[in-house]
Swiss-Prot record:
Cellular localisation: Secreted
Name this protein carries in UniProt: Conotoxin Sr5.5
GO molecular function: toxin activity
Organism this protein belongs to: Conus spurius
UniProt tissue specificity: Expressed by the venom duct.
InterPro entries associated with the record: T-conotoxin (IPR031565)
Family recorded in the similarity comment: Belongs to the conotoxin T superfamily.
Post-translational modification: Contains 2 disulfide bonds that can be either 'C1-C3, C2-C4' or 'C1-C4, C2-C3', since these disulfide connectivities have been observed for conotoxins with cysteine framework V (for examples, see AC P0DQQ7 and AC P81755).
Keyword Lipid biosynthesis: no
Domain notes: The cysteine framework is V (CC-CC).
Domain of life: Eukaryota
Length: 44
């Protein structure tokens, strides 16, 4: 659970970041989720 604050911050950054379209935003979101799972594997 210690990666939860990091994950929340990343989600806020994604939500506030201007995106060209929703598809690009979704791809970025998936990349960050994969990174979180690889870095903090105990959270998945």
């Amino acid at each position: 659970m210690r990666c939860l604050p990091v994950f929340v911050i990343l989600l806020l950054l994604i939500a506030s970041a201007p995106s060209v379209d929703d598809n690009a935003k979704g791809t970025q979101h998936k990349r960050i989720i994969n990174w979180c799972c690889l870095t903090f594997y105990q959270c998945c």
